[in-house]
Amino acid sequence: MNSMTGEQSICFEKPPYLFASASVAGKKEGEGPLGEKIDLICEDPMLGEENWEKAESMLQIKAIQLALEKAGKMPQQIRYIFAGDLLGQLIATSFGVEELEIPLFGLYGACSTCGETLSLAAMTVSAGYADQVLAVTSSHFGSAEKQFRFPLGYGNQRPLSATWTVTGSGAFLLSAQKSHAKITGITTGKVVDYGVRDSLNMGACMAPAAADTICQNLMDFNRFPLGP
């Protein structure tokens, strides 16, 4: 049976499989070092929509459609969607997945939403509550700036060192059906606040929590990082 492991982890007796995945991103992301690994690059940041929020919804639906296409699955075969975004009331997710008519668990974890959706989706499949589940997340530079910092129309100047929110979406299909990769366990992180107040340095805000979770994962599963 599934078991609690260490202080913050779970080990799956029946690990769920990563059956398919897909990624969609904007032009800037496509020009970066990971560009060739992205499935679909959208040159138009608006994706043909009238506002940033609708553009982010379009990112989600495109990523989901690609993942389903890779898996050879139809929306009717998916039991649940675990999905989230960076916006209030998860509006990008709500409007993005509406047409699929799949039961939705809306999740908000900011930059940890991807890990959060995968964790809960994996628990659901491993426990036998579903056989096919989607885990989805998205963000958009324009919509995030509008909600959290300065709307692009304001014309605020950013330092060259400023962190940029990704314009993109990722979708994962977890399944009880065997595939090339599986999730053997999860470690859930805690809120760790070192008092960083610079909204243009998101990495510094998140790094302490990330480091704490990685360290706890290694201890809970009795693993050690690879040496030089």
Predicted regions and their residues:
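Condensing-enzyme catalytic core mediating Claisen C-C bond formation in acyl metabolism
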Residues: 1-53, 151-216, 220-224
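Solvent-exposed alpha-helices and their adjacent loops that cap or buttress functional pockets
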Residues: 7-12, 73-74, 96-99, 113, ...
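Active-site-proximal alpha-helical scaffold in enzymes
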Residues: 107-135, 174, 208
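Short beta-strand segments
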Residues: 19, 83-84, 133-139
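Short, well-ordered amphipathic alpha-helical segments that serve as non-catalytic structural scaffolds
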Residues: 56-72, 118-120, 205-221
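Conserved beta-ketoacyl condensing-enzyme motif
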Residues: 18, 53-109, 227-228
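Short, well-ordered, mixed-charge alpha-helical segments that flank or form enzyme active sites
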Residues: 90-91, 141-146, 191-195
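A glycine- and small-aliphatic-rich helix-loop capping segment at beta-alpha/alpha-beta transitions
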Residues: 34-37, 93-103, 125-127, 148-157, ...
